[in-house]
């Protein structure tokens, strides 16, 4: 008779318990605790029990579904036992529980060995391969992104587009000619090039009538036809040199306290206050005594009459006057309306200048005086 096959329970139960404790201790390790958090719960296929780890499933299967059987004498009519232990992970079957336990350990080691955890994340983020772990570690924890703006000409790096623009404007400034396609970064070279697009024009002017001509021959013809009754050919004259201007002291730039406008010198500031901020334009009476102001003499007389501690002020607008030039300036400003009305009935102004020397700028009374004056430049 064939001997019936029986599932034998390991006789050394302490050995099995030691393996279970070893599995439990292995499951309590930091790596396994991380894997438990990430893996799904395991359900026993023999009952409705749900286990959180493979080792717990093994212990449950061992204690609940593998009963301890006593050896019995098999009869010749009994059929061989075909019940085998099945793995819930890969559906492999085994003849006894010892083989099943060894097989389950391989599943546990393979699961834990396939996961790679981030050493920086507090929750221990798992990854299936080393490449994913390194990519996460680099991009999330170790990467420092720095944006730089590179100059397209000299490859210099700058932290912002504004700094790059300032560098480009200062270091690579170009001077472009508007008449041609010439470009350069040197200012001196650009000025030399600009001379190619300019021409020199010499004009010859008449000192008597202030007319100008493009050539000396045209000027001679003009003098012959306009300023000489007889045939006259003036000799070639040297180019007159204007007299050197007298050196004047440098004036300070002052600021008006009313409108903050900048003017040159104290006289310029006084004139600015008079013409821009004086509220009384014309007046025919003194503001202090209400006597009429007939002319410049009476205006000056009232300035002296109403002065206090040698401090003069205008009898019309009461503005302080520092010098005689200011007194005459205020007189001309406030009494010009009277002068203009009286001048309509009187003779024309005798101190007007109609002739000006084109060489030195001196003003002369008539044309004959201008002719005599031009002789000093010959």
Swiss-Prot record:
- GO CC terms: chromosome; nucleus
PROSITE patterns, A to Z = ZINC_FINGER_C2H2_1, ZINC_FINGER_C2H2_2
Just give the chief location class: nucleus
Q: Where are the transmembrane segments?
A: none
- Spell out the residue ranges making up region: Disordered: 1-36, 61-80, 231-250
Where is there biased composition of kind Basic residues?
1-14
S-adenosyl-L-methionine found in the keyword field:
no
Swiss-Prot/TrEMBL keywords: DNA-binding, Metal-binding, Nucleus, Repeat, Zinc, Zinc-finger
Give residue ranges of zinc fingers (C2H2-type).
42-65, 85-107, 204-226, 254-277, 284-306, 312-334, 355-377
What spans are recorded as compositionally biased (Basic and acidic residues)? 16-26, 62-71
Q: Which residue ranges have biased composition labelled Pro residues?
A: 235-246
Among InterPro entries, the record links this protein to: Znf_C2H2_type (IPR013087)
GO MF annotations in UniProt: chromatin insulator sequence binding; zinc ion binding
Compartment list: Nucleus
Q: Which GO terms describe its biological process?
A: regulation of transcription by RNA polymerase II
Q: Does the keyword Mitochondrion apply?
A: no
Q: Which PANTHER family does this chain map to?
A: C2H2-TYPE DOMAIN-CONTAINING PROTEIN, KRAB AND ZINC FINGER DOMAIN-CONTAINING
What is the name listed in the Swiss-Prot or TrEMBL entry for this protein? Putative zinc finger protein C09F5.3
Q: From which organism does this entry originate? A: Caenorhabditis elegans
């Amino acid at each position: 008779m064939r001997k019936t096959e029986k599932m034998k329970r390991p006789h050394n139960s302490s050995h099995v318990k030691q393996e279970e404790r070893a599995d439990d201790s292995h499951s309590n390790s930091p790596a396994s605790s991380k894997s438990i958090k990430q893996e799904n719960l395991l359900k026993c296929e023999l009952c409705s029990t749900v286990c959180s780890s493979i080792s717990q499933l093994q212990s449950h299967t061992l204690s609940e579904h593998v009963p301890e059987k006593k050896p019995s004498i098999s009869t010749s009519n009994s059929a061989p036992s075909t019940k085998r232990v099945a793995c819930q992970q890969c559906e492999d079957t085994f003849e006894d529980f010892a083989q099943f336990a060894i097989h389950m350990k391989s599943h546990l080691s393979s699961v834990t060995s396939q996961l790679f955890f981030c050493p920086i994340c507090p929750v221990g983020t798992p990854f299936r391969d080393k490449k994913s772990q390194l990519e996460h570690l680099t991009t999330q924890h170790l990467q420092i992104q720095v944006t730089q703006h590179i100059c397209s000409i000299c490859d210099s790096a700058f932290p912002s587009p504004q700094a790059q623009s300032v560098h480009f404007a200062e270091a690579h400034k170009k001077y472009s000619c508007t008449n041609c396609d010439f470009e350069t970064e040197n200012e001196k070279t650009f000025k030399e090039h600009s001379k190619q697009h300019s021409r020199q024009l010499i004009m010859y002017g008449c000192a008597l009538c202030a007319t100008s001509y493009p050539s000396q021959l045209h000027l001679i013809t003009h003098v012959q036809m306009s300023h000489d009754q007889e045939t006259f050919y003036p000799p070639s004259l040297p180019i007159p040199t204007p007299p050197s201007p007298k050196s004047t002291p440098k004036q300070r730039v002052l600021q008006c306290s009313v409108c903050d406008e900048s003017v040159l010198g104290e006289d310029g500031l006084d004139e600015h206050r008079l013409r821009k901020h004086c509220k009384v334009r014309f007046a025919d009476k003194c503001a202090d005594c209400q006597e009429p102001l007939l002319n410049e003499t009476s205006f000056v007389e009232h300035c002296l009459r109403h002065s206090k501690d040698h401090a003069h002020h205008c009898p019309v607008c009461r503005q302080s006057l520092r010098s005689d030039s200011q007194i005459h300036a205020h007189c001309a400003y406030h009494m010009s309306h009277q002068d203009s009305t009286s001048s309509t009935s009187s003779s024309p102004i005798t101190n007007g200048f109609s002739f000006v020397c084109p060489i030195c700028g001196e003003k002369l009374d008539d044309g004959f005086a201008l002719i005599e004056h031009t002789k000093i430049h010959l």
